[in-house]
C-alpha cells in the first residue's frame, strides 16, 4: 500500500491485486483476538484510501500464477499484463510441515484469523460453564500459546489481563483460577530479537501476571485435545495458539531456485528478484542479503516493508523514466527500534540507545502505534477503546459472531476455485 501511495503522480498505472478489499494493521491484530478492539478499527478499505487517485485501480482477486517471460499475472478473475510486477503478499504461518498442528492450531496473522480466535476463546468460556466433566472444563480453560516472540508475549499478556479483569465480572459463577495460560518457547528467552534486559523484563512481567512460561520446549504434535512436547510432556487444551514462525507466501510460476531461507525470494539491493526481468519483491516475501548490517536478511517486520516500498517507488520512477542502474538507490534498512507491550503499564522499548521498561515504555508504545493507524476516525476509535479499557478495567468487544455468506457469494467462490488456475497462460 505504501508503494502505491508513493507512486502517485509518476505517470504510471497502478493496479493493486488483493484477495481482501482492505489493508490491515498487523501490530494490533492480537487485540482483536483478545476482544480489545473492533476489527474495523485497524482495517482500512483500499477503495476509500485511494478514491481520489485517477491512476489507481483495485481488483479483489487471488494471484494464481505468473509468466515472467510473457509478463502476465494469472489471477482468479483472469490474466493481467504488466510492465513491472511487485510481490508484496507478506507471509503466512509456518507449521513446519506438521499436519496435525496445521489442522488444529489457531494462527493469528490476519484479521479473520484473529476474529476466529476471539470467537473460539469466548465460546470455550461459555462451554466451560455447562460441560459435563472436569476434564473437559480444564481443556476449555487452558490456553496454550506457542512462540515467545512479540506476538506471543503480547497475546499472553492480553489474555492474562482478561483473566484478571474480565472473567470475574462477566462469568461470576466460574472459578477463574482454573484458567491457565501457557507460553511455550523452544529457545531460552522471550523476545529473541531484543536485548537480554528487555527479554528478562518481559519474562518478569508475564510471570507476575500468572503466565506459565516454559523454555526449551518443542511442540511436536496435537492429538486428543493435548499439546504434545518433544520431551513427552503434554498440556490438555482446546485453545491452541500457534505464533511460532512464518514463511513467505508462494508465487507459482517463479522457480524454486529463486527462493532462499523461509521460502523468501532472493532479491538484489534494488529489490529485484535475481534473474527475472521487471519482477520485484518487498517485505516478508523477499530475502535481501546485500545490506551489510543484515547479511542473513532483514527481520520480517512492518518497518522493513515500509522502507523498502518507499525506496522501490523512487527507483521505479527512475527506471520508468529510462534511467540506468547507476541512478538507482540501493536499499539500506534504518532500524527504528523494537517494542512490545505486555499489559497495563507494562512494555519494553528499544529505540537506538534508548532502553525503557514499564509505564513510560507503555505510553511510548501507545503513541507510536496510534500514530501508525490510518485515518482520524480509526485513531479515535482505538484511542477511545484503550481509554475505556484503562479506566474501567474492561474490554469492550465480547460478542460471539459467525459470518454467514450468502449463497451467491459461496457459489462464486466455488467457481473461482476451479477456474483461472493458469490455463490462460497457455493460450
PLM features: residue spans?
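Beta1-alpha1 glycine-rich phosphate/pyrophosphate-binding loop at the start
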Residues: 1-59, 64, 150-193, 241, ...
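Short glycine-rich anion-binding loops that position phosphate/pyrophosphate groups of nucleotides
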Residues: 90-93, 156, 246-248
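A Rossmann-like FAD-binding core segment of flavoenzymes
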Residues: 54-65, 160-269, 273-275
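Rossmann-like dinucleotide-binding core of oxidoreductases
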Residues: 137-194, 201, 212-214, 299-330, ...
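Cofactor-binding loop segments of dinucleotide-utilizing enzymes, especially the Rossmann-like FAD-
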Residues: 17-19, 89, 148, 186, ...
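FAD-binding core/adjacent interface of flavoenzyme oxidoreductases
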Residues: 56-144, 241
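FAD-site-proximal beta/loop scaffold in flavoenzymes
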Residues: 103-133, 225-228, 234-307
Amino acid at each position: 500500500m505504501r508503494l502505491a501511495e508513493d507512486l502517485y503522480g509518476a505517470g504510471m498505472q497502478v493496479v493493486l491485486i488483493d484477495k481482501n478489499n482492505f489493508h490491515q494493521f498487523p501490530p494490533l491484530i492480537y487485540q482483536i483476538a483478545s476482544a480489545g478492539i473492533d476489527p474495523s478499527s485497524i482495517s482500512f478499505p483500499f477503495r476509500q484510501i485511494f478514491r481520489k487517485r485517477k491512476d489507481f485501480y483495485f481488483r479483489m482477486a487471488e494471484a494464481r500464477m505468473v509468466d515472467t517471460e510473457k509478463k502476465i499475472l494469472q489471477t482468479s478473475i483472469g490474466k493481467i499484463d504488466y510492465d513491472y510486477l511487485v510481490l508484496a503478499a507478506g507471509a503466512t504461518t509456518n507449521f513446519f510441515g506438521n499436519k496435525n498442528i496445521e489442522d488444529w492450531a489457531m494462527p493469528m496473522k490476519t484479521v479473520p484469523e484473529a476474529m476466529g480466535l476471539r470467537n473460539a476463546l469466548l465460546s470455550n468460556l461459555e462451554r466451560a460453564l455447562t460441560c459435563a466433566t472436569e476434564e473437559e472444563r480444564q481443556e476449555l480453560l487452558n490456553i496454550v500459546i506457542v512462540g515467545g516472540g512479540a506476538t506471543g508475549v503480547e497475546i499472553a499478556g492480553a489474555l492474562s489481563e482478561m483473566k484478571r479483569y474480565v472473567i470475574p465480572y462477566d462469568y461470576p459463577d466460574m472459578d477463574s483460577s482454573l484458567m491457565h495460560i501457557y507460553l511455550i518457547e523452544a529457545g531460552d528467552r522471550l523476545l529473541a530479537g531484543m536485548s537480554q534486559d528487555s527479554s528478562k523484563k518481559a519474562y518478569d512481567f508475564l510471570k507476575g501476571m500468572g503466565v506459565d512460561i516454559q523454555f526449551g520446549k518443542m511442540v511436536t504434535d496435537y492429538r486428543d485435545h493435548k499439546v504434545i512436547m518433544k520431551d513427552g510432556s503434554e498440556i490438555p487444551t482446546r485453545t491452541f495458539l500457534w505464533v511460532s514462525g512464518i514463511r513467505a507466501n508462494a508465487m507459482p510460476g517463479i522457480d524454486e531456485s529463486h527462493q532462499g531461507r523461509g521460502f523468501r525470494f532472493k532479491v538484489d539491493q534494488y529489490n529485484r528478484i535475481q534473474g527475472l526481468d521487471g519482477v520485484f519483491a518487498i517485505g516478508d516475501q523477499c530475502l535481501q542479503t546485500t545490506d551489510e548490517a543484515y547479511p542473513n536478511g532483514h527481520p520480517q517486520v512492518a518497518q522493513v516493508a515500509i522502507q523498502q516500498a518507499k525506496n522501490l517507488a523512487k527507483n521505479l520512477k527512475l527506471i520508468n523514466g529510462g534511467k540506468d542502474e547507476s541512478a538507482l538507490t540501493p536499499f539500506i534498512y534504518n532500524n527504528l527500534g523494537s517494542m512490545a507491550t505486555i499489559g497495563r503499564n507494562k512494555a519494553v522499548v528499544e529505540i537506538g540507545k534508548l532502553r525503557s521498561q514499564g509505564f513510560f515504555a507503555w505510553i511510548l508504545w501507545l503513541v507510536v502505534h496510534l500514530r501508525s493507524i490510518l485515518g482520524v476516525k480509526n485513531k479515535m476509535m482505538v484511542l477511545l477503546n484503550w481509554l475505556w479499557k484503562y479506566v474501567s478495567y474492561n474490554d469492550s468487544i465480547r460478542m460471539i459472531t459467525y459470518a454467514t455468506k450468502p449463497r451467491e457469494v459461496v457459489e462464486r467462490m466455488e467457481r473461482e476455485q476451479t477456474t483461472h488456475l493458469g490455463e490462460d497462460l497457455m493460450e
